[in-house]
Amino acid sequence: MARWRPDMAEREATPEALYLRRRDFLALGAAGAVGLLLPRGARAGDPTGAALQVARKVDQAGGETPTPWDSVTGYNNFYELGTSKEDPSRNAGSLRARPWTVTIAGEVKRPQTLDVDALVRMFPPEERVYRMRCVEAWSMVIPWVGFPLADLVRRLEPTSRAKYVAFQTLLDRDQLPGQRRPVLPWPYVEALRIDEANHPLALLAVGLYGRVLPGQNGAPLRLVVPWKYGFKGAKSIVRITFLADRPHTTWNDAAPDEYGFYANVNPEVDHPRWSQARERRIGEFFRRKTLPFNGYAAEVAPLYAGLDLRKNY
């Protein structure tokens, strides 16, 4: 597949310096909207963590303003670190992101175990500004740092039997204390069809806002699929498995009427308990219309030609 070429110029992505100058206003907006609590000792808008070198910066969010750092890192769903939105940032210190390896298995010609730092050396990361839409009807705009999942897939040489790719989160009740409670069947597993995994927009993220990925955001390696609801983005990945048959996935198994396997953002298919037609952007007061495929329909809709998206939600 041809490598994705964004039509947005690099200068349209918001520089971190500009973001820092307006952080007070935006942070107050986010806090008022969602009651955001900052991690203890943190100040609004102070990015932390080691800086990452990026090969290029591109905007695939239509020039929308990125959500402030303190909101992106302080308002999270990561049940392995707790079920409230503030738990992940409070508990992230227990997650040890180095050393870290990822096991590649299944229907590939080159199964192997890779160190996450070796992955970064193999595939120089780039910054991509993406919209993120949660199934809970809130959204953000996040400048991720990572590399195309398709680059890794090609290097691994899937066999002709490989139709799906599954991503498994770390299972460690000491590092991820939320796993001590049977909130979900652990470990967390998500999956994509092989053609979705090969789409140029699918990203394996190792950072955000030019910094290494914080624990609460899925350090050191997480999946980002911007046209799908956020729960498809497996965090703290330790295993990637190529499969002939569709695997079981965590939320789809736990509540299939509420969380579909495809989980494509679709304003015409409501969650059983709320509408998906509108969303609240973190930091904004009024709701906005939700876009089909989260605004990426032109790029990804052909993947689902002929598929009934109401039944295959």
Curated annotation (Swiss-Prot):
InterPro entries: MsrP (IPR022867), OxRdtase_Mopterin-bd_dom (IPR000572), OxRdtase_Mopterin-bd_sf (IPR036374), TAT_signal (IPR006311). It is found in: Periplasm. Residues 1-44 form the signal peptide. Gene3D superfamilies: Oxidoreductase, molybdopterin-binding domain. It comes from the Bacteria. Binds 1 Mo-molybdopterin (Mo-MPT) cofactor per subunit. GO terms for biological process: protein repair. PROSITE patterns: TAT. Its EC number is 1.8.5.-. It catalyses: L-methionyl-[protein] + a quinone + H2O = L-methionyl-(S)-S-oxide-[protein] + a quinol; L-methionyl-[protein] + a quinone + H2O = L-methionyl-(R)-S-oxide-[protein] + a quinol. Mo-molybdopterin binds at N76, Y79, E80, C134, T169, N217, R222, G233, A234, K235. SUPFAM superfamilies: Oxidoreductase molybdopterin-binding domain. Its main location: periplasm. Predicted to be exported by the Tat system. The position of the signal peptide cleavage has not been experimentally proven. GO terms for molecular function: metal ion binding; molybdopterin cofactor binding; oxidoreductase activity, acting on a sulfur group of donors, quinone or similar compound as acceptor. Keywords: Metal-binding, Molybdenum, Oxidoreductase, Periplasm, Signal. Part of the MsrPQ system that repairs oxidized periplasmic proteins containing methionine sulfoxide residues (Met-O), using respiratory chain electrons. Thus protects these proteins from oxidative-stress damage caused by reactive species of oxygen and chlorine generated by the host defense mechanisms. MsrPQ is essential for the maintenance of envelope integrity under bleach stress, rescuing a wide series of structurally unrelated periplasmic proteins from methionine oxidation. HAMAP family: MsrP (MF_01206). Heterodimer of a catalytic subunit (MsrP) and a heme-binding subunit (MsrQ). This is Protein-methionine-sulfoxide reductase catalytic subunit MsrP. The lineage of its organism: Bacteria, Pseudomonadati, Myxococcota, Myxococcia, Myxococcales.
